[in-house]
Each structure stands twice: as C-alpha cells, then as structure tokens.
C-alpha cells in the first residue's frame, strides 16, 4: 500500500477432530482477522474482529460418563464443563515487536460479553448449572492476556545467550466458572519447562493421579515460563544448546479436583518447577530439527525434600524427559 507496508484481511474456517478412547470431540470455528504492520515493519498488529467456535461432543463412552461425569462421588466441575457443548464468541487484539535480537508479543482477548448483553435483553434460557444458553448451548465468558519477551545476546557469530519470559492469565467470569479446554494453559513439553512431558506439570503442586483425566486436570488459568538458553555452533549444520527452564501453571479459583493448584501470592514462588538440559539442533536455515533432553531440578509436586529436589537425588526414569520438535523453542 501507500505506506510501504501491506495490510491483510484473513477469513478462516477450521474443523478440528479429536478422537480419544473415552470420547470424540469436534470444534468448528470461523474467524475474521485483520493484520497490518508499521512502516518500518518492526511492529505487526493483529485484530481478531470476530471469532466463533462451536465445541460439541458427538460421543462419550458410557463407562467414562458413568465414572466421571454422572457419578455423584466424582462430580468433577472442570471435566463436566468441558464435556458439554459450548459456544465461544471472542474478539481480540495483539501485537508483535521484532527488532531482531529483541521480540515482544502481547495480546488480549475477551469472549461472551456481547452475548451476555443480548442474553439480558432477550432473556436467554438457563441450563441446570445456571448458565445462559444460545440455541440450547451455553456460551463461554472470559478475559485472557498473554505477554512474551525474548532477548538474544550475541557474543560472537556462533555464540548466543537467549533469555525468554512468558506470562499468560485468563479469568472466567459471568457465564463461566471454568475456562474452556481450548483456552486453558498447560506446562511442560518442548516449548516450556522441558524436564516435564507436555501437560505433565502443575497446576501448582498438584500431582497427576489418573491417566484418563490428567490431560484436563493438569491445566490452569495462568502460566509462567522463564528460560535461559546458551546456543553455540558445533560443526556443519549442527548447533548445540545448554538450558535452564523454570515455570508452572496455576488456577485462579480453587477447584477441589486440583488440590494445591490455586495461585497464591505467598506460596507460588515455592511451586516454580525448574529443569536443566542439553539440546542438539540440525539447522537447515529454512527449518530446524531439534532434540532436547532435560532433567528435573526442582519438582513442586513433592513436599518431601528428597523428591522435591531431584537435582540432588536424580532418578533417571522419573526425572528425564526427551523432546523432538521442529523450530526453536523461542
């Protein structure tokens, strides 16, 4: 355009299928986005004008339904909420500042406020949990904020220290007491605290107890990541890395099914998980293959000194995690 920068409008339609042994989940979404850069190209803005998602469950296994959703002794609110059909109508704004050795990303999104207004005017019906419904489907209401900072300190052509911090907070309110599964934070994995496998860490000092539902119990409303990574060129296309990662996720409300998971100002720093490791990267320029191996150093899921500090008492089978990924972690 005239400014020497190009704005773009994106119309997207997506269909997501998730088939697990316990359930089938479908997400249909459509969105209108508008992106534009500043004249120098350093800042890219993104406006989510409108984004609609419809989440529905065509099938849930009878035993799973009986054991977790209908059982009076195990009325898991987080599970139950995430196994009901849901409508998400959101809008958002984000920006990315990229100065080469310094990258900042920030975004905010809100959902359900417009529908909440309509529900007051048109008196939408309520379901058994007191949630207002549109076409017999409850709608989600939340606000979400994400901030990410990466700094590269280049000592020479082949040696770089990368610093990275990430903070995400989402608050369900109004029509929602629980964040939709798609919007919940998780920790661990190739781009987080690498001493844990994906969705294996947190929230807080909560420890996963049930393989069938840990993937949803080990999610939260808040995420903190702090990473330090030294990168060096080895030979040919191979680069090496040594890193330390710290972080966790937390819930903002207290949920009985996630004991020890709530964020509290006076205890959260004791629940920060730490891991350390080495990485090997095969760098082809246009894409990077990455192998990272990490050991747990501080594990908030255990109170006992020996298990809480695996850096002093490492157990290979319990404390090691291996990741294969495409692209850099940050």
Name these PLM-found stretches:
Residues 23-25, 40-46, 57-59, 116-122, ...:
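Outer-membrane beta-barrel and related beta-rich outer-membrane complex signature
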Residues 28-29, 50, 63-69, 121-128, ...:
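Flexible, surface-exposed loop regions and adjacent strand-edge segments
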């Amino acid at each position: 355009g005239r400014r020497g920068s190009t704005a773009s409008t994106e119309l997207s339609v997506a269909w997501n299928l998730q088939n697990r042994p316990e359930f089938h989940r479908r997400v249909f979404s459509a969105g209108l986005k508008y992106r534009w850069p500043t004249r120098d190209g350093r800042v890219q803005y993104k406006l989510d004008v409108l984004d609609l998602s419809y989440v529905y469950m065509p099938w849930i296994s009878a035993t799973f339904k009986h054991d977790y959703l209908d059982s009076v002794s195990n009325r898991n609110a987080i599970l139950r909420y995430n196994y009901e059909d849901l409508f998400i109508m959101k809008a958002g704004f984000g920006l990315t500042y990229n100065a080469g050795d310094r990258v900042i990303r920030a975004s905010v999104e809100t959902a359900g406020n417009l529908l909440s207004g309509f529900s007051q005017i048109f008196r939408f019906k309520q379901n058994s949990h007191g949630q207002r419904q549109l076409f017999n489907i409850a709608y989600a209401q939340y606000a979400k904020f994400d901030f990410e900072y990466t700094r590269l300190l280049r000592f020479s052509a082949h040696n770089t220290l990368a610093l990275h911090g990430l903070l995400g907070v989402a608050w369900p309110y109004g029509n929602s007491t629980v964040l939709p599964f798609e919007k919940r934070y998780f920790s661990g994995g190739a781009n987080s605290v690498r001493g844990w496998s994906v969705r294996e860490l947190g929230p807080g000092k909560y420890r996963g107890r049930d393989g069938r539902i840990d993937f949803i119990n080990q999610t939260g409303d808040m995420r903190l990541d702090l990473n330090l990574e030294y990168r060096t060129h080895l030979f040919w296309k191979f680069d090496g890395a040594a890193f330390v990662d710290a972080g966790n996720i937390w819930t903002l409300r207290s949920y009985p099914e996630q004991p020890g998971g709530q964020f509290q100002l006076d205890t959260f720093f004791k629940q920060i998980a730490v891991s350390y490791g080495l990485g090997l990267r095969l760098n082809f320029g246009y894409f990077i293959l990455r192998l990272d191996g990490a050991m747990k150093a501080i594990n908030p899921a255990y109170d006992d000194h020996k298990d809480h500090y695996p850096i002093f008492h490492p157990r290979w089978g319990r404390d090691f995690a291996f990741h294969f990924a495409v692209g850099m972690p940050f």
